């Protein structure tokens, strides 16, 4: 396969295709004055057609990848498959969100409830190259500005006002994220399995997370990044996992600049991974020292399952430090103004978001018990994780 379709090249091509697909859908449907989605079956039918085309594109990508990866297969088929699958995921986002909203310039739920401050925040970000607060002049923003700042630059580039840019920027960012996460899954798994997981993740995101686009972007990458994090803190060799360390650091830094709640979950999980990796490595070193003549395959952690003896015990902590300090440095780009003001006593010490706990935050989510298609899929995944936890590094992650 040409280098241009490996790693960053493939991600770049998928990003361009996702942007092109989204632009075609949004621009094309804006040329016709459609009735509101709830009052006509026309947009419903067109949405189904778009979704069917998206799933068909993913299936074509899977079939092409499988045919090309067989002995004697054509490399061109693999390239088509690797591009068709992420493009299908992006089209699924554009069709599911862009077509039903074609009759409106507003995003999901209009400007009601939380969408009011999100639209306002993007409007403020479009008027300044800095990091303004969503409501108050000359105050640093407590809410992470990363996604909104980029949305402001999108508004400047397209010549749209901030409130009008919120819908296309939301759909575009979700489509690009869906394409990139599909690319990442195809790199972590086989191309065909990665395509299926990528489009399934996109569908779940659309069903449950799309009203909060910046949070959905962060959540979409959380599962594959945690697999990379496990490779980072528990590599198969002393030199292995460096790329995974860099990817985890970049993700945590970007997520902290975008949505801190998911960042806390991800960071806590990575710390737990490092603790487990260190403990298992220490146990393996101790057992190996007690029985130096014992065959490696008879020791507690065979190389195919968990190879802690191939790296020193201090390596998980060192990798964790690199990830932690690196991600903090990235996050400070967005958080520094607020932290400087906080150290000076400027922000209020009451009535802020630090004192707010929503209903969802007081519950332990157990989607595998919810029933329905999503619940059954989550339950099947949980069973697989438990069954393969000892033999699969992905299940361990």
Where are the model-predicted features located?
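Structural signal for the C-terminal ends of transmembrane alpha-helices
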Residues: 2-5, 59-73, 225-236, 272-285, ...
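Aromatic-rich transmembrane-lumenal/periplasmic boundary elements in polytopic membrane proteins
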Residues: 76-139, 329-352
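Transmembrane catalytic cores of multi-pass membrane glycosyltransferases
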Residues: 107, 114, 213-214, 255-290, ...
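Membrane-embedded helix bundles of polyisoprenyl
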Residues: 89-93, 173-278
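Start-transfer (signal-anchor) and selected internal transmembrane alpha helices
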Residues: 1-21, 25-103
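Hydrophobic alpha-helical transmembrane segments
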Residues: 51-57, 165-181, 265-269, 372-386
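Active-site lumenal/periplasmic loops and adjacent helix-entry segments of GT-C-fold
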Residues: 97-219
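Membrane-interfacial loop-to-transmembrane alpha-helix junctions, especially the N-terminal start
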Residues: 5-21, 78-85, 193-194, 239-245, ...
């Amino acid at each position: 396969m040409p280098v241009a379709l490996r790693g960053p090249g493939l991600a770049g091509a998928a990003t361009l295709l996702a942007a092109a697909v989204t632009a075609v859908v949004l621009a094309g449907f804006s040329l016709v004055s459609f009735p509101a989605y709830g009052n006509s079956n026309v947009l419903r039918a067109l949405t189904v057609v778009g979704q069917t085309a998206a799933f068909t594109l993913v299936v074509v990508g899977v079939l092409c990848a499988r045919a090309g990866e067989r002995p004697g297969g054509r490399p061109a088929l693999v390239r088509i498959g690797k591009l068709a699958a992420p493009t299908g995921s992006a089209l699924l986002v554009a069709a599911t969100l862009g077509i039903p909203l074609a009759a409106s310039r507003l995003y999901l739920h209009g400007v009601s409830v939380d969408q009011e401050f999100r639209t306002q925040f993007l409007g403020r970000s479009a008027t300044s190259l800095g990091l303004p607060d969503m409501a108050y002049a000359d105050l640093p923003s407590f809410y992470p500005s990363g996604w909104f700042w980029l949305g402001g630059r999108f508004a400047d580039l397209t010549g749209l006002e901030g409130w009008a840019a919120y819908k296309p920027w939301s759909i575009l960012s979700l489509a690009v994220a869906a394409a990139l996460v599909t690319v990442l899954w195809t790199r972590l798994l086989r191309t065909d399995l990665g395509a299926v997981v990528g489009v399934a993740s996109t569908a779940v995101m659309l069903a449950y997370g799309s009203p909060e686009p910046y949070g959905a972007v962060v959540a979409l990458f959380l599962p594959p990044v945690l697999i990379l994090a496990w490779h980072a803190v528990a590599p198969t060799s002393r030199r292995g996992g460096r790329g995974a360390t860099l990817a985890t650091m970049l993700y945590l830094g970007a997520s902290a600049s975008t949505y801190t709640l998911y960042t806390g979950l991800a960071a806590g999980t990575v710390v737990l991974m490092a603790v487990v990796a260190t403990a298992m490595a220490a146990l393996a070193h101790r057992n190996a020292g007690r029985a130096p003549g014992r065959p490696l395959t008879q020791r507690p952690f065979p190389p195919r399952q968990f190879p802690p003896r191939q790296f020193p015990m201090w390596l998980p902590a060192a990798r964790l430090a690199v990830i932690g300090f690196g991600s903090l440095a990235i996050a400070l780009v967005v958080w520094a103004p607020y932290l400087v003001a906080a150290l000076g006593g400027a922000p209020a010490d009451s009535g802020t978001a630090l004192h707010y706990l929503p209903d969802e935050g007081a519950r332990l989510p157990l989607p595998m018990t919810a029933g329905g298609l999503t619940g059954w899929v989550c339950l099947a995944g949980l069973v697989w994780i438990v069954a393969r936890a000892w033999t699969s590094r992905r299940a361990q992650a």
